[in-house]
């Protein structure tokens, strides 16, 4: 069973962004810890601050995008128990979130990739070259270059970037298919042994003749 969690943080961010105000880092960090617990994600002490910085940028970007929709809240779904720390591309599939069943509204949401930048996502899951610059499409969609909760339906550029990532991985996997060599047909001469034919009556020279087995018919 899934628990529907109301993220008041993003609601507050959406409203405060319009007034040029941002929640304090202490509030955001507490929400960051809650996000880690929900997805079963852990960091070393050396990575904690850098991951929080990326996550904070993503959350503020999500709030900015959702603030243009003029909706009051954002929902995201988590399981009762923490999920595996192993992240897969299947988790990036789009999910539609509706705040009110009577309204056809699609919103952005956080997911377990929300602590990654676009370059980190490409390097880890698409085998991209880290020396290459982020595409203009992705950069124009997210000013921070971040992978946000891919629960989209409104941003064509973000969906396109996600689809391109999947295609790159698929092509890379196809190139790694093992090459199977074709079998080589060979011929071999068969030596035929001479024979005098088949003795259908089985009349061998030393055939044993049993007296008790004979029968006389008049």
UniProtKB/Swiss-Prot annotation:
Q: Which organism is it from?
A: Dictyostelium discoideum
Parts of the chain on the Extracellular side:
20-146
- State what protein this is by name: Uncharacterized protein DDB_G0286021
Q: Which residues lie on this side of the membrane: Cytoplasmic?
A: 168-218
Q: Which GO terms describe its cellular component?
A: membrane
TM stretches of this protein: 147-167
Q: Name one Pfam family in it.
A: Inhibitor_I29
Localisation:
Membrane
Q: Which domain of life does the UniProt lineage start with? A: Eukaryota
Signal peptide interval: 1-19
Q: Which UniProt keywords apply?
A: Membrane, Signal, Transmembrane, Transmembrane helix
Its membrane topology is listed as:
Single-pass type I membrane protein
């Amino acid at each position: 069973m899934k628990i529907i969690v109301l993220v008041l943080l993003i609601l507050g961010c959406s409203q405060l962004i319009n007034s040029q105000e941002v929640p304090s880092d202490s509030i955001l960090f507490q929400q960051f810890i809650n996000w880690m617990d929900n997805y079963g994600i852990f960091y070393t002490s050396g990575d904690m601050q850098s991951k929080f910085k990326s996550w904070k940028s993503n959350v503020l970007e999500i709030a900015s995008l959702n603030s243009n929709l003029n909706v009051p809240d954002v929902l995201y779904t988590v399981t009762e128990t923490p999920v595996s720390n192993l992240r897969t591309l299947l988790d990036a599939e789009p999910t539609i979130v509706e705040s009110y069943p009577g309204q056809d509204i699609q919103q952005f949401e956080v997911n377990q990739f929300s602590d990654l930048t676009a370059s980190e996502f490409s390097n880890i899951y698409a085998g991209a070259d880290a020396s290459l610059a982020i595409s203009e499409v992705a950069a124009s969609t997210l000013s921070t270059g971040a992978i946000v909760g891919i629960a989209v339906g409104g941003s064509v550029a973000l969906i396109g970037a996600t689809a391109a990532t999947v295609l790159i991985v698929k092509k890379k996997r196809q190139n790694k298919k093992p090459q199977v060599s074709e079998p080589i047909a060979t011929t071999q001469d068969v030596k035929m042994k001479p024979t005098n034919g088949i003795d259908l009556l089985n009349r061998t020279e030393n055939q044993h003749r049993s007296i008790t087995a004979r029968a006389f018919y008049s």
